[in-house]
Amino acid sequence: MTMLFSVQASAELTAIANHDHISIDFFYHGSNVSVRGVSDPDADLIIKITSPEEHQALRQKGKVAGLLWMNVGTINFEHVPSLYFLASTKKVDDILSKDEMAKDVVGYEALEKHVELKPVKDEEEKAIWFGEFVKYKEHSKLYSVASGNITFTRQDGKQNYYTLFEWPYQAIPGVYTVTVYAVKNKKIVEQAESKVQVEQAGIVKRLAGMAKNNAAVYGILSIMAALGAGFGVGLIFRKGGGAH
């Protein structure tokens, strides 16, 4: 089930994340998250959805003895969100200063500076591995940066905005933060937040509890359920943040 919360930052800007209840159950394949609210008609908008920051790892592949491709090392990422979505009225670089982007970690360039990578020998190597990490995340539909995808309507003398995000099944349970920024003259002048809490339900929740408390029983039930359903239940439980 997805629980929704909204916070109004001021009388001008509001943010509400709103969609049907989502249960991560046995047949869950993702959903949609819409974000809407009221905004200043003279301001550009940036909408960001992120998970809490965490540690993630990306495995390095290389040839061993000049013959076989194998894992030859691991790049560790610190302070990185498992999910990062960004939507804006225009390209972020065109409407927000570098300092403002860095302060609120808006955009891939700011995220790259914010994230710590180990081991890397210099900024050039960091940029290469961060780029590979973003490609992996985008392929998994966990990272997305897009512009021009916010629509506006006028009602009762107010400007209403709306955008829609495809919510990937790979996103793990937890609390996600939706932040809406109002931007003028390349500075953030207002912001509003919503929280989206995603939870497991039904058999998935029970099996997840078994996986934690009784791995042997979980393994047997997972195989039986997979044979009955035609796909591996284990796929449902894989963490969206893990990179292989």
Regions found by a protein language model. Give the residues of each.
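A short tyrosine-centered beta-strand micro-motif
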Residues: 161, 174-180
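Juxtamembrane interface at the cytosolic side of transmembrane helices
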Residues: 214-244
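N-terminal edge beta-strand
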Residues: 11-28
